[in-house]
Regions:
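Conserved SAM-binding loop
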Residues: 2-85
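Short, Lys/Arg-enriched, disordered terminal segments
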Residues: 1-2, 180
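S-adenosyl-L-methionine-dependent methyltransferase catalytic module, highlighting the catalytic core
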Residues: 61-62, 66-68, 72, 76-180
Length: 180
């Protein structure tokens, strides 16, 4: 089973092959993620993890297409990014892309964005997305923060269009499944 952590940095994810642009301790493969193709065969990867990387890459649609190329059918892909309204999205000068709740719908054939636009041949089911995973996973979320996350989860488009500019959440984690 091949599991890849793209843009791992210095943190080693157990059971994953770690890919980063820098040769840091724990990095298994040094590769620039703006250089295509990635050093993996078509249909060879079983699971992909990408934590706070996609916002640094100038062509995120091409990156997603490359992840799709190397993935097997039903590969699980987890991608975490700063939420576009968050101040974290803008404090890092190396961030070149910004993400809202509907960004991956352009790859999901169940969604009108994919059926009307078809910008890409890559197809992914958007299984779910989670706001502020790093807070909820560690159970460090206060009562009001948790209420806001729960509202945004139940009514993501309402939150994004009406409330997020007033009370922005920090991050989005997308859980995707490859369709082939």
């Amino acid at each position: 089973m091949i599991k890849i952590d793209f843009g791992c940095g210095a943190s080693k994810k157990p059971g994953f092959t770690d890919v980063d642009i820098l040769k840091l301790d724990g990095v298994d493969i040094v590769h620039n993620l703006t250089s295509f193709p990635y050093p993996f065969e078509d249909n060879s990867v079983d699971e992909i993890w990408m934590d706070n990387v996609l916002e640094h890459l100038p062509n995120p649609m091409r990156v997603v297409e490359e992840l799709w190329r190397i993935s097997k059918k039903d590969t699980k892909i987890t991608i975490a990014v700063p939420y576009f309204r968050s101040h974290y999205a803008f404090i890092d000068p190396t961030h070149v892309n910004f993400f809202g709740v509907n960004w991956f719908n352009y790859f999901d054939p169940r969604h009108v964005f994919w059926t009307k636009m078809q910008y890409s041949h890559a197809r992914l089911n958007v299984d779910k997305f989670v706001f502020d995973r790093e807070w909820t996973d560690n159970n460090t979320c206060g009562f009001l923060h948790r209420m806001l996350i729960n509202f945004a989860k139940r009514r993501p488009n309402t939150y994004e269009s009406k409330l997020s500019h007033l009370i922005p959440l920090n991050s989005l984690t997308f859980y995707l499944t490859v369709i082939k």
